[in-house]
Amino acid sequence: MGAGGQLNAMGLSSNQQKGERNNSFERINESHADDTVFIVGGYTRCELLAHTPKDESKIGDDDDEENASFSVEERKASKKEENDEMKSKAGVHVLSLDGRTGQLEMVTTNDIGPNVAFVTRHPTKPDVIYASTERIDVEGEVVTMRLTRDLRLKEIARCSAGGKSTCYLNFNKSNRYMMSVNYWDAKLALIHLDDLGRPETPNTVFMQPGAKYVDDKKPTREEHWEFRQRWPHSHCIVTEPYHNMLHFVVDLGLDRIFVYRVGEPSTMVTAPEFVCKASVKLQPGKGPRHLVFHQTLKTAYLVNELDSTVSVFNVNVNDEWMEQLPLANEQPTMKTFDDEKDTKEESDETAALNVFQCISTLPEGSREQKVFTDRGVWKAASHASEIRVHPSGKFLYVGNRGHDSIACFKIDAEDGSLEFIAAVPSGGKCPRNFHFSANGGFVCVGNQNSSNVASFAVCPESGMLELVHVRHSVCLPNYVYPIPKSTLDLVTSSDDDEDVVL
């Protein structure tokens, strides 16, 4: 056919196809300050996970009348076929949100996986996107992708994340190292980034106290379902915003928060290391999950997954912790936390985090609901998931899986304490993750078990949420990452680029 290329099934040449994608990109480029692109990670192989998400998006209470004439068996078979088709395309979805209306549009679907569980962007390289893979059979991976101008994601590299069920990625202050957190075996890894932003083999893997349980006992996920706190489960590594030097690791299994510094090596033949500066013990059984810091107040908020509460802390940053660390001088290695040597627990007055409030994420009447598994093991009817502070600093939100709602709180401008506003239905089942649009006018919620993403308008005065739109066929969403559309001008990679050049 010459320069026009071969026709596809719709009769479009390759050049015409590129033109269609460019037109779509131009439509997205009709700017509004709150226009946002959301990268949504999704589960694709549930048998590899520590938990068991259920895709209820095609059958159940929401079935329409058209399907009512079919038997349950026929509907299940149809559901499986549709879900298999969805999963074959799934991995990472790219959605665009209209900053005027809150409407969501599916832009691209990228076959990257399995089980993309966390998504983030390089701090200084706008083309570079990272994702972690969540699995317990082998070590998870950090997947490096290139974002193109037509909003596709091209995988360019993979490396080990240093442990299993990789659930969180972050960067140290110099941006020379990525920090990964692995839930299943409570291992933290430091991974050097090359000049193009590509992560290399982990330089240092650090085992949290008690983490050898996984290596020694080889627990099954059935054991995990019954005993969520039998061994450590590190869930996130969050950097304080005051100096960008202290990294807070929350461990669900230990009911503890550890405070680390990263010691960088003097040469690339030596290894970096985590240096523990403090740890904070929490009330047993809370099951802490994620920590966030207020933008202007020295206040931190911790969501406790197992009892559906938020703990509110005053933050105390010790000046001595900011002093220069001695340079690491050992070869890349596996390190184990020395509980007696490395744990530093202070009094309430000098603790890194001093709790002064604990508040439920559930409305009255839903706080004491319990269910029992088939084996008679107690389990709460709802478990808290993500926690985020609104960009305005005026409100805080938490996901409730089971209650299927987003809890809304007002933040006191003086002391950072919380006032419960309401729990708003999440627009689906099992709201696992959510994030705000560029200016905070909307919040997008990934509902895992209904395979949809719902957008809500945020009232700037009250903080209440109003459902605007639900985008279906987003397979088992588990992480929602926003990119302000205004920053897409910095993305220079085009769809025509065949070589991997960042």
Ranges and model annotations:
Residues T109-G113, R158-G162, F227-Q229, S279-P284, ...:
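Surface loop/turn motifs at the tips and blade-to-blade linkers of beta-strand repeat domains
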Residues Y43-R45, E134-I136, Y183, L193, ...:
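Short loop/turn segments immediately following the C-termini of beta-strands
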Residues L95-G102, M145-L151, L190-T201, R261-A271, ...:
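Short loop/turn segments immediately following beta-strands, especially the blade-tip
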Residues A381-D415, A423-V445:
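Loop/turn-rich, solvent-exposed surfaces of beta-rich toroidal or solenoidal domains
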Residues R152-C236:
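Asp-box/WD-like beta-propeller blade repeats and closely related beta-sheet repeat scaffolds
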Residues T204-Q229, A278-S279, A328-W378, H472-T487:
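Surface-exposed loop and turn segments in beta-propeller and other repeat-based domains
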Residues D35-T36, P126-D127, S174-R176, Y242-M245, ...:
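Short coil/turn segments that connect the beta-strands within blades of beta-propeller domains
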